[in-house]
Structures are given as structure tokens and as C-alpha cells.
Swiss-Prot record:
Keywords for the protein's UniProt record, in alphabetical order: Host cell membrane, Host cytoplasm, Host membrane, Host-virus interaction, Membrane, Phosphoprotein, Viral budding, Viral budding via the host ESCRT complexes, Viral matrix protein, Viral release from host cell, Virion
Keyword field contains Nucleotide-binding: no
UniProt record similarity statement: Belongs to the morbillivirus/respirovirus/rubulavirus M protein family.
Protein's recorded name: Matrix protein
């Protein structure tokens, strides 16, 4: 069993909403490009901005033509057919220009895509035609980028391996960063196990503007019968001295003194941001890597949910602190289905 503390509404109501990406088509029946920028924290009103960008679009392959070798092959533009949708995260950089200049530069990119595999399925991106507005990101764009296929492609199995594939950018998601920065809790700290401790996890409840059942994300009915989605993230451990007794009130008081503020961003699709505005113990602060603002991209927490809702309207409707006994150190984590040294099964 776990004890729950519900955060007050004011802790997430200011920046807890993301507007949807409008999907409109032009005379050629192609989607009209659109840029969506959301502010996290208090960015400067004028001048320089720090932007985290995610490019969204369609994977396309050239259509096969019947009149091979004709003169029209040299004069007519190549037509493409859509074989999937996906994204390309390009990171954070300092940007001085306008949103429309950035959108134009992103849609002009030539992005070639290849589906491959290492320990798991991967998507390889190679980028060309980098315009001036994207020069702050050029250090990353000029190098080949590899991502987990299940995080950046909605249906990687639909991407052919024997054809040329391109990513046509249609939408640009941007997170404008102010006092809040993008810092993730390192995996070694998130997986930390301390004896005599209580794990503080956050249960985040979302309301979206689309139906997600047909795409494999089942909602949960709340007390009012409304369909909601939720996910959990780990914040840290509360540890007491040997002999001290844990109580729900003690854990609640520790959380209340932190004065946490929650917001939604667009890092990797949809991201959940936590800012500490109150006091923290040194033990808890060290578990946050000495950061007072941390980011939880849904791309890392729940990739499939992220891909289903990253273009929809999303709103935080509740955040709960869940106090659970920390997992004992002697419990073993099995990241693979094939376990070592069991019968005739052996790992190389």
C-alpha cells in the first residue's frame, strides 16, 4: 500500500496546459507547416532565447514511376508517398531570430532516414541544407544522429529497409527556457536504493483533446467519469535516522516545504517539469543532482503515450505525491527477458 498527498491546484495551473498543433492542409492537400512555442519558467520578453526543438513530420519514400528513363524524369519533381510519422529532437541552443524564420529553415532541411538495429531497433538521421536560423544547432545537425526507433517513430515496422526514406518536417515544437533549465535526474541517482527510506514518486494525471484508445493508450476513468491518462516519475528518497518512525505527516511536511511548481513543456514531444521553490535537505538535493529544476520527457518515461499525444492539447488535472517503501537493495532488476544461468539459457 502507498500513501498519497495531492498537490494544490495552484502548483500546476499556470503552465500546466499545452495547446494542440493545428493540422490544416493547403490546395495541394499537404499539411501546412506550423510552429508551436511554449514558455517554461520566465524567459526574457525580448532578444535572445534558449530554445529546445523537436521536429515533427512524415516519413516518405519516392513513388515508383512506370516511364523509367523518359525525359520527364529529369524535368518533373519526384513525388513521394507517406510510410509513417516521426520526430527528430535536435536539442537546446541560443536563438535570436523569429519563429517564422525558424519554421522556414526547419521545413527546408533535407533529412534522410535509415532504419537499422543495434541492441534494439534504431533510426538514423542525416541532415543537409542547414539554413542560417539553424546554425546554433548545426554542431548536432551536421553529425549523424541515432535514436531508439520506438521513441521517435510511431510505427517503425512500416519503414522499408530497401528504399530511400526522407523525413519531411511539418511541425516544430519548441520549449523556450527561462529560469527553468532542462536537467534530467541521472539514471544512477534515479535507481538509487537506500536502506530505511521512503520513495517519493509523482503521479501525474493528464487530460487530452483526442481519443487515445484506438492507438493503444487506454485512459482511466476518474471520480467524475472523465477519461484521463497518467504516468509516474521518481523524484527521490526520504531517509530517516535509524530508530525514527516514518509517518505520512512527516513525509507530507517534507514535500510541502519544497513548494514544488509543475509545468508542461515540449521537450521530446511532451515533457513534465518540476521546479523547487522552497527548501530541500542536502540528501534530497543530491538526488536531484543539485538542480532545483528537473525535466521528465515523456519520450523517456512512456514513449508510446508520448507519440500518441504529442500533437494534441494536453492539460495537467492533478499531481499526487505517492509515498512508497523504497525497493530493497537485494531485489534484482531484470532488464532482459532472457535471464542468465537458468537451465540451458546462457547469455554471451
Amino acid at each position: 500500500m502507498a500513501d498519497i498527498y495531492r498537490f494544490p491546484k495552484f502548483s500546476y495551473e499556470d503552465n500546466g496546459t499545452v495547446e494542440p498543433l493545428p493540422l490544416r492542409t493547403g490546395p495541394d492537400k499537404k499539411a501546412i507547416p506550423h510552429i508551436r512555442i511554449i514558455k517554461v519558467g520566465v524567459p526574457p520578453k525580448h532578444g535572445v532565447r534558449y530554445l529546445d526543438l523537436l521536429l515533427l513530420g512524415f516519413f516518405e519514400t519516392p513513388k515508383q514511376t512506370t516511364n523509367l528513363g523518359s525525359v520527364s524524369d529529369l524535368t518533373e519533381p519526384t513525388s513521394y508517398s507517406i510510410c509513417g510519422s516521426g520526430s527528430l529532437p535536435i536539442g537546446v541552443a541560443k536563438y535570436y531570430g523569429t519563429d517564422q524564420e525558424l519554421l522556414k529553415a526547419c521545413t527546408d532541411l533535407r533529412i534522410t532516414v535509415r532504419r537499422t538495429v543495434r541492441a534494439g531497433e534504431m533510426i538514423v538521421y542525416m541532415v543537409g541544407s542547414i539554413g542560417a536560423p539553424l546554425l546554433p544547432w548545426s554542431g548536432r545537425l551536421r553529425q549523424g544522429m541515432i535514436f531508439n526507433a520506438n521513441k521517435v517513430a510511431l510505427a517503425p515496422q512500416c519503414l522499408p529497409v530497401d528504399k530511400d526514406i526522407r523525413l519531411r518536417v511539418v511541425f516544430v515544437n519548441g520549449t523556450s527556457l527561462g529560469a527553468i533549465t532542462i536537467a534530467k535526474i541521472p539514471k544512477t541517482l534515479a535507481d538509487l536504493a537506500l536502506p530505511n527510506s521512503i520513495s517519493v514518486n509523482l503521479l501525474v494525471t493528464l487530460k487530452t483533446g483526442i481519443s487515445t484508445e484506438q492507438k493503444g493508450v487506454l485512459p482511466v476513468l476518474d471520480d467524475q467519469g472523465e477519461k484521463k491518462l497518467n504516468f509516474m516519475v521518481h523524484l527521490g528518497l526520504i531517509r530517516r535516522k535509524v530508530g525514527k518512525i516514518y509517518s505520512v505527516e512527516y513525509c507530507k511536511s517534507k514535500i510541502e516545504r519544497m513548494r514544488l511548481i509543475f509545468s508542461l513543456g515540449l521537450t521530446g514531444g511532451i515533457s513534465f517539469h518540476v521546479q523547487v521553490t522552497g527548501t530541500l535537505s542536502k540528501t534530497f538535493m543530491s538526488q536531484l543532482a543539485w538542480k532545483r529544476a528537473v525535466c521528465f520527457p515523456l519520450m523517456d518515461v512512456n514513449p508510446h503515450m508520448n507519440m500518441v499525444i504529442w500533437a494534441a492539447s494536453v492539460e495537467i488535472t492533478g499531481v499526487d505525491a505517492v509515498f512508497q517503501p523504497a525497493i530493497p537493495r537485494d531485489f534484482r532488476y531484470y532488464p532482459n527477458v532472457v535471464a542468465k544461468n537458468i537451465g540451458r539459457i546462457r547469455k554471451l
